[in-house]
């Protein structure tokens, strides 16, 4: 009797997943920088210019992941705007959370010869190598994997010289009994935040913004 009941429950869950599956791209909202607990907002006496990140993933600029439902239905997960906008905004938020004055900088090709940092002590730009979340939804078993890789360049505005180049890597995995857009966004937010925090924890970079 219990075995038959389990079969009915699983079949019902599978049918529910299929019936609720939305075809086509789905907007994933709420992906953002998460300020670590205990972060102290300082009073940095520098102005940091943030140039728009370049999306080097080789994917559509608004797509940041995929959801697969019971191996039958797939949805692209998309962001409002572009992934480059998302990362650029995340870096700005990370700096502001630490009391750093942030200024929008023009597009930068990441070479020392083209540094334009008027009114900025530091200029930051970078490339998005990876930013992706995969969600596989099975009845009572949802696996989420998020990965972020960024290459970041930091330049001294006065000297017109790149003083730091870092590759930031982060991965995050979780398993849940039910799918939720909130948990998916949280997983990718955590991976993005972890990557950006590596820059903020870098000793040489910290010296420049203190």
Language-model features: locations:
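Sec-dependent bacterial lipoprotein signal peptides
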Residues: 1-20
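A structural "domain/chain start" motif
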Residues: 20-93, 203-210
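Surface-exposed short loop/turn segments
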Residues: 21-33, 106-161
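Generic short beta-strand segments
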Residues: 52-56, 127-133, 169-170
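Short secondary-structure boundary motifs at beta->alpha junctions and helix caps
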Residues: 68-82, 155-201
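Sec-exported extracytoplasmic/periplasmic mature domains
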Residues: 92-100, 196-205
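Surface-exposed patches in mature extracellular/periplasmic domains of secreted proteins
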Residues: 99-108, 138, 208-209
């Amino acid at each position: 009797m219990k075995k038959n009941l389990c079969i009915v429950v699983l079949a019902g869950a599978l049918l529910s997943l299929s019936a609720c599956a939305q075809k086509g791209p789905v907007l994933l909202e709420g992906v953002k920088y998460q300020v670590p607990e205990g972060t102290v907002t300082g009073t940095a006496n520098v102005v940091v210019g943030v140039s728009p990140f370049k999306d080097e993933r080789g994917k559509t600029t608004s797509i940041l992941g995929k959801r697969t439902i019971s191996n039958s239905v797939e949805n692209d997960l998309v962001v409002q705007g572009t992934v480059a906008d998302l990362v650029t905004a995340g870096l700005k938020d990370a700096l502001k959370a630490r009391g750093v004055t942030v200024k929008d900088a023009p597009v930068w090709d990441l070479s020392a010869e083209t540094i334009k940092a008027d009114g900025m002590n530091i200029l930051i730009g970078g490339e998005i190598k990876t930013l992706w979340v995969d969600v596989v939804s099975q009845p009572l078993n949802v696996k989420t994997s998020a990965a972020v890789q960024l290459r970041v360049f930091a330049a001294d505005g006065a000297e017109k010289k790149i003083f730091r180049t870092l590759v930031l890597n982060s991965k995050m995995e979780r398993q849940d009994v039910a799918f939720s857009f909130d948990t998916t966004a949280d997983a990718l937010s955590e991976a993005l935040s972890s990557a950006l925090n590596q820059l903020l924890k870098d000793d040489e970079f910290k010296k420049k913004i203190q």
